């Protein structure tokens, strides 16, 4: 039963702290209007309210809606021909690495024999 009371108090304290940390919207608007110097920033004012961002080039703005863009990109990555080509390239690289390791091991063994003879 104590756990329920502790949990309720923790929730109440969290809600109280989070709600008191945010200023009211009236105070927020007045702070934005009074604290931003107009000579430093190039801002647009409409009806006495400062706009944060202005986009002049609307033609270049592209939005991806739905799954079209993500789905097309995913399907491009799932090309089986490219996957087979990549697997073949990886296998060739592994074979080359194994060949080089074998050559290095043979050279190392030869050097050990040469050092051991002296």
From Swiss-Prot:
Signal peptide stretch: 1-21
Superkingdom per UniProt: Eukaryota
Cell compartment(s), UniProt: Secreted; Host nucleus; Host cytoplasm
Gene Ontology CC annotations of this record: extracellular region; host cell cytoplasm; host cell nucleus
Motif stretch (RxLR-dEER): 50-64
Pfam families: RXLR
Keywords, comma-separated and alphabetical: Host cytoplasm, Host nucleus, Secreted, Signal, Virulence
Induction: Expression is induced during host plant infection.
InterPro entries to which the protein is assigned, alphabetical: RXLR (IPR031825)
Disulfide bonding pattern of the chain: none
Family recorded in the similarity comment: Belongs to the RxLR effector family.
Function of the molecule: Effector that enhances P.infestans colonization of Nicotiana benthamiana leaves.
Domain text: The RxLR-dEER motif acts to carry the protein into the host cell cytoplasm through binding to cell surface phosphatidylinositol-3-phosphate.
Name of the protein in its database record: RxLR effector protein PITG_19617
Species of provenance: Phytophthora infestans (strain T30-4) (Potato late blight agent)
């Amino acid at each position: 039963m104590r756990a329920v009371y502790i949990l309720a108090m923790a929730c109440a304290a969290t809600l109280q702290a989070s709600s008191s940390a945010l200023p009211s919207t009236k105070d927020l608007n007045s702070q934005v209007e009074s604290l931003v110097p107009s000579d430093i920033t190039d801002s647009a004012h409409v009806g006495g309210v400062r706009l944060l961002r202005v986009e002049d080039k609307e033609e270049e703005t592209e939005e991806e809606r739905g799954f079209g863009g993500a789905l097309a990109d995913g399907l491009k990555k799932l090309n089986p021909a490219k996957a087979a080509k990549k697997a073949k390239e990886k296998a060739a690289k592994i074979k080359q690495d194994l060949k080089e390791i074998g050559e290095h091991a043979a050279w190392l063994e030869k050097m050990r024999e040469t050092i051991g003879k002296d």
